[in-house]
């Protein structure tokens, strides 16, 4: 294969059989279980990189079921997302996500900079309870519960919240194994959102300590709200808003 062909065909690795296809990435009946809680403000601020700002000491713990996604297939994801502001405008910062499928893990890290690790999240309905769990190896590190569809939420308001920009700290190491080749803050949004349902109810969240899945480093002090959402949406491509290596 000549150099010109490599340049023209290179998208992702392996060159001749990429781990994931080019976008757009459309999700049908994407199901969210989001528990927002109050946490320790000093610990939270220590984990959020400038120039993002933390308006309140809040964390959203998410369980997301994606049974029908373009190119990525059928998978589940779980992790912590932090409400932030950038240049005075509201958004979210994804701290860490854990999922059970390689293509979105590889694509998420390589394209946008999603901080993904391989684990075993689950989101299901158990009788009258919406139940989310996260296992890292044999260890249960997160359990979320909510009363199933106790009260409907306003769909337009929830769509606006989903449409807020999300920020990611994309880090790609140099081949020397010591320094970062890429270290940048990226921004992406969910697009073409079609809300199909939104509910709330009484909720609980239990986090356990684990050295490699440190979700409990942001302790649960108070549950603020819980939401169960179902929507079709497209995960938009990103843009770089801050380059930490620029001089």
Swiss-Prot record:
It holds the Pfam family ADC. Signal peptide: none annotated. Its EC number is 4.1.1.4. Keywords: Decarboxylase, Lyase, Plasmid, Schiff base. GO terms for molecular function: acetoacetate decarboxylase activity. The keyword Magnesium does not apply. It is an enzyme of class 4 (lyase). It catalyses: acetoacetate + H(+) = acetone + CO2. The keyword Ribosomal protein does not apply. The active site is at residue 116. Belongs to the ADC family. Catalyzes the conversion of acetoacetate to acetone and carbon dioxide. HAMAP family: ADC. This is Acetoacetate decarboxylase. It comes from Ralstonia nicotianae (strain ATCC BAA-1114 / GMI1000) (Ralstonia solanacearum).
């Amino acid at each position: 294969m000549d150099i010109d062909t490599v340049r023209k065909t290179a998208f992702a690795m392996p060159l001749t059989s990429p781990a994931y296809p080019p976008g757009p990435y459309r999700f049908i009946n994407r199901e969210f279980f989001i528990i927002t809680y109050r946490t320790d403000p000093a610990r939270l601020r220590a984990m959020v990189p400038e120039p993002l700002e933390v308006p309140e000491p809040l964390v959203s713990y998410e369980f997301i079921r994606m049974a029908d996604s373009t190119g990525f297939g059928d998978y589940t994801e779980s992790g912590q997302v932090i409400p932030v502001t950038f240049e005075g405008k509201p958004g979210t910062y994804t701290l860490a996500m854990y999922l059970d499928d390689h293509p979105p893990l590889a694509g998420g890290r390589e394209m946008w900079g999603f901080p993904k690790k391989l684990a075993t999240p689950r989101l299901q309905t158990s009788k009258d309870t919406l139940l989310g769990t996260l296992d890292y190896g044999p260890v249960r590190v997160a359990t979320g519960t909510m009363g199933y569809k106790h009260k409907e939420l306003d769909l337009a308001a929830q769509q606006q919240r989903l449409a807020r920009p999300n920020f990611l700290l994309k880090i790609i190491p140099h081949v020397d194994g010591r320094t970062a080749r890429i270290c940048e803050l990226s921004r992406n949004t969910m697009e073409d959102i079609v809300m199909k349902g939104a509910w709330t109810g009484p909720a609980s969240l239990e986090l356990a300590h684990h050295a490699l899945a440190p979700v409990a480093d942001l302790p649960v002090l108070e549950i603020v709200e819980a939401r169960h959402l179902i929507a079709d949406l497209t995960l938009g491509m990103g843009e770089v808003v801050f380059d930490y290596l620029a001089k």
